[in-house]
């Protein structure tokens, strides 16, 4: 942890706004490592007056979106825990999920619902192994949750898919 923090500190000293990736968070020691690491980053951020974003990476797609799922695989628990035990504001939390077990959309939606301000996506879910969270899936999830398209033209999803074919 100290080596990572020293790199973040050097970046902050040079005025760089860091985004720290909490890789493999769904297999990590959440309370023994993740929360203390978030606290240490918050201290550096406060000292430098520069916000530090935290990207929660479900590196192997092992996250579980349902309330009550056990840690460290619980997406609601991870986001809730970082917000309430790690004191990380929603505006500095983002979710980066992989689709190895076809849960990328439900996990990203759970991260949103529990307070992450962003979910990383790719067109058609294209990415390593079985892919990332498909942007078009999250667009549909957003519309379902909000009850509106908010002016988005959903017809372009078909056009994009046809272009990629």
Language-model features: locations:
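Catalytic cores and adjacent flexible loops of soluble metabolic enzymes
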Residues: 1-165
């Amino acid at each position: 942890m100290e080596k990572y923090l020293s790199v973040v500190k050097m970046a902050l000293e040079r005025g760089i706004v860091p985004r720290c990736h909490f890789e493999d968070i769904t297999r990590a020691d959440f309370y023994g490592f993740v929360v203390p690491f978030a606290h240490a980053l918050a201290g550096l951020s406060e000292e430098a007056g520069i916000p530090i974003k935290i990207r929660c990476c479900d590196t192997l797609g092992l996250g579980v979106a349902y309330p009550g799922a056990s840690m460290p695989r619980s997406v609601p628990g991870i986001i809730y825990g970082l917000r309430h035990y790690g004191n990380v504001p929603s505006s500095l939390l983002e979710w980066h999920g992989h689709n190895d077990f076809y849960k990328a959309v439900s996990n990203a939606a759970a991260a949103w619902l529990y307070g992450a301000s962003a979910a990383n996506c790719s067109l058609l879910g294209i990415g390593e192994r079985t892919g990332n969270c498909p942007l078009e899936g999250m667009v549909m999830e957003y519309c379902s949750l909000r009850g509106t398209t908010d002016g988005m033209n959903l017809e372009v999803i078909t056009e994009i898919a046809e272009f990629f074919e």
